[in-house]
Curated annotation (Swiss-Prot):
The gene is Vcath. This is Viral cathepsin. The active site is at 137, 270, 290. Cysteine protease that plays an essential role in host liquefaction to facilitate horizontal transmission of the virus. May participate in the degradation of foreign protein expressed by the baculovirus system. It comes from Choristoneura fumiferana nuclear polyhedrosis virus. GO terms for biological process: proteolysis.
Length: 324
């Protein structure tokens, strides 16, 4: 095909897909219909439109500046960044991060390993879940890791009860937030965790109804990792399994697809599950499983560039556990 024709086709496709801020009212009406949104008053609708327009301007700016990722109008488009973070994340940072999980300092240079690794390809990662309007990302990331540990050890899937962890973990704060290593500690203290089918998710704080006779996974030891070298997460991922990590979710809210090169860290506020890494067009990236449903991002997943501390991924909070 003629190179000029090919360029015009590609350029035209990109232009057709691009947003125009002048069309914000049309996009907003489409958004209301698609996501079945309604508001209590016209003044509230106007306020939400103003937030929507601000988010649209950010999306347009990101799509212009980030050549390897795309951003879109999604279900969070009428929420301010602060609203999204307060309602749909849930990592809570106390003054004291110590507990009886063993602390491991990853201060040695990374080993030479494969350029690509993905636990999904080995069929060891359970389906994407949706935490809803409950700050329980910490519970989902922690149990997502245990679900993968179970799959690695027993070669079968099981979905564990985030609701049990929300209701029965008295160190963390349920839908008001928690941490990864303290959640592993809570599972150890409880003696185990039930299946989601026995203790279904309700997306709110409730009374503890744990039944020890129905525990399906028990934790024998937990770890918290201090990462000096970001690349060392590769070794950890391959040897341990999918790893719950802490990030700043502010820049991923309107993510659609691709490798994010720009993801700031203004403060850790969200927990996700690191499941793999790879290289695309010379850009190395991490693969992370989110808990905002399969209709967000790349079927519930997102990718960020490695070795730039994207979203603050290099920190003292990655955690894991061994199961019986």
């Amino acid at each position: 095909m003629n190179k000029i024709v090919l360029y015009l086709l590609v350029y035209g496709a990109v232009q057709c897909a691009a947003y125009d801020v002048l069309k914000a009212p049309n996009y907003f009406e489409d958004f209301l219909h698609k996501f079945n949104k309604s508001y209590s008053s016209e003044s509230e609708k106007l306020r939400r439109f103003q937030i929507f327009r601000h988010n649209l301007e950010e999306i347009i700016n990101k799509n212009h500046n980030d050549s390897t990722a795309q951003y879109e109008i999604n279900k969070f488009a009428d929420l301010s960044k602060d609203e999204t973070i307060s309602k749909y994340t849930g990592l809570s940072l106390p003054l004291q991060t110590q507990n009886f999980c063993e602390v491991v300092v990853l201060d040695r240079p990374p080993d030479k390993g494969p350029l690509e690794f993905d636990w999904r390809r080995l069929n060891k990662v359970t389906s994407v879940k949706n935490q809803g309007m409950c700050g329980a990302c910490w519970a989902f990331a922690t149990l997502g890791s245990l679900e993968s540990q179970f799959a690695i050890k027993h070669n079968q899937f099981i979905n564990l009860s985030e609701q049990q962890l929300i209701d029965c973990d008295f160190v963390d704060a349920g839908c008001d937030g928690g941490l990864l290593h303290t959640a592993f500690e809570a599972v150890m203290n409880m003696g185990g965790i039930q299946a989601e089918s026995d203790y279904p998710y309700e997306a709110n704080n409730g009374d503890c109804r744990a039944n020890a006779a129905k525990f399906v996974v028990k934790v024998k030891k937990c770890y918290r990792y201090i990462t000096v070298f970001e690349e060392k997460l590769k070794d950890l991922l391959r040897s341990v399994g999918p790893i719950p990590v802490a990030i700043d979710a502010s820049d991923i809210v309107n993510y659609k697809r691709g490798i994010m090169k720009y993801c700031a860290n203004h403060g850790l506020n969200h927990a996700v599950l690191l499941v793999g890494y790879a290289v695309e067009n010379g850009v190395p990236f991490w693969i992370l499983k989110n808990t905002w449903g399969a209709d967000w991002g790349e079927q519930g997943y997102f990718r960020v560039q490695q070795n730039i501390n994207a979203c603050g991924i290099q920190n003292e909070l990655p955690s894991s556990a061994e199961i019986y």
